[in-house]
Design a protein with these regions (language model features):
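Eukaryote-biased intrinsically disordered, low-complexity acidic regions enriched in Ser/Thr/Pro
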Residues: 1-121, 125-128, 137-140
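Eukaryotic intrinsically disordered and solvent-exposed regulatory patches
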Residues: 3-7, 40-44, 50-54, 58-62, ...
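Short coil/turn segments at secondary-structure boundaries
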Residues: 6-7, 25, 32-35, 70-71, ...
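Beta-strand-rich binding-surface signature
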Residues: 14-18, 51-55, 64-66, 71-73, ...
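Residues in well-ordered beta-strands of folded domains
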Residues: 20, 75, 86, 147, ...
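Conserved beta-strand elements of beta-rich interaction domains across eukaryotes
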Residues: 24-27, 61-63, 73-74, 79-81, ...
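Internal glycine-rich, Lys/Arg-flanked active-site/core loops of soluble domains
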Residues: 100-210
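Segments that shape or occlude catalytic/ligand-binding pockets
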Residues: 167-171, 177, 185-310
Length: 310
């Protein structure tokens, strides 16, 4: 959501302007290239045309930022980091390296298939995820650990899929959600390494809304599909995991491209099962207020966090 703190009308034109930020790689990226930025060039341009001296505040699940048009700066309000921004024609050549590792990944090792990084409970990232799990996810349990999954291969596939869907559908934004998936702790290593496997989905719980990978809006619901275990979380490229006494459960918090949903049926193998055209991107239980989502292409999923709780 964008908030315009100053409003003043300016003359508009038909010039196809776009907005760019200077990335850590030293190249200019269009705002749409970063999935974490909750605003598009078009939205920013509309506010700029109203007042070129305005200050915009914006927030999403994982990002709180501010754009100062006078200073031409983009500020991350959580970390205080600033990036230069500029306004230019949309014909400008764009840098394509946006799918490199996100800047907040720590101790990133590109030689490893993935890393499972425990978050400090005092970090803003931990507190954001913890609050989302309990408030939006309705999980009334004691969270023992939150681990960030750092898998560059899966991240690149997700970014490419997002650009492909937007290009095919002729849209500038596609609906993304943070959704939960419950599973056994023995599956953590496989999912972190290879992503969720549609071929293995529904083996134990059926295919009520389609033969795909199931996600829940609420962590409490996803937790019902996670078995209690005495096993510790696997360690791969991260710090040594604490061994918690007693049985624990795990759930994944994933970034999911749900796009345009359609009501699912048990025999569906893709959202538009009986239509040769792909008009929808996911299946749901109830289109108006979905709580269950079914994804048929793993590239529409990036597993972001593993959450362990008792």
């Amino acid at each position: 959501m964008l908030e315009n703190t100053l409003v003043e009308y300016m003359d508009t034109s038909d010039t196809p302007w776009c907005w760019y930020y200077l990335a850590d790689c030293g190249q200019w990226h269009q705002f749409e290239d970063d999935p974490d930025l909750p605003f598009s060039s078009e939205a920013v341009e509309n506010f700029y045309l109203k007042n070129s001296k305005a200050v915009l505040n914006t927030s999403s699940f994982s990002y709180k930022g501010q754009i100062d048009f006078s200073a031409m700066l983009l500020t991350d309000l959580t970390t205080g980091r600033q990036k230069r921004i500029r306004r230019s024609y949309n014909t400008e050549k764009r840098c394509s390296c946006f799918s490199l590792a996100p800047v907040f990944w720590e101790s990133f090792d590109p030689e490893r298939p993935y890393q499972l990084i425990p978050l400090s409970e005092h970090s803003p990232e931990y507190q954001t995820v913890d609050r989302y799990v309990k408030t939006d996810g309705l999980l009334d349990r004691t969270i023992l650990s939150i681990n960030r999954i750092q898998n560059l291969d899966l991240w690149e596939l997700y970014c490419r899929k997002k650009k492909q869907l937007m290009r095919i559908q002729g849209i500038k934004e596609i609906q993304e959600r943070r959704l939960f998936h419950g599973t056994d702790i023995k599956n953590v290593d496989y999912i972190c390494k290879y992503n969720f496997d549609v071929r293995l989905a529904g083996q134990h719980h059926g295919h009520v809304f389609g033969k795909g990978i199931y996600f829940a809006k609420h962590a409490a619901l996803a937790g019902k599909y996670s078995k209690s275990s005495l096993e510790p979380l696997p360690v791969y490229g991260g710090k040594t995991q604490l061994v918690h006494s007693g049985e624990t459960k795990i759930i994944f918090l994933a970034r999911v491209m749900t796009g345009k949903p359609v009501a699912g049926e048990s025999d569906f193998q893709k959202p538009d099962h009986r239509n040769p055209e792909n008009l929808h991107d996911s299946c749901v239980d109830v289109v108006s207020h979905p709580k269950i989502f079914v994804i048929f292409d793993p590239n529409q999923i990036y597993p972001e966090y593993v959450i362990q709780y008792s």
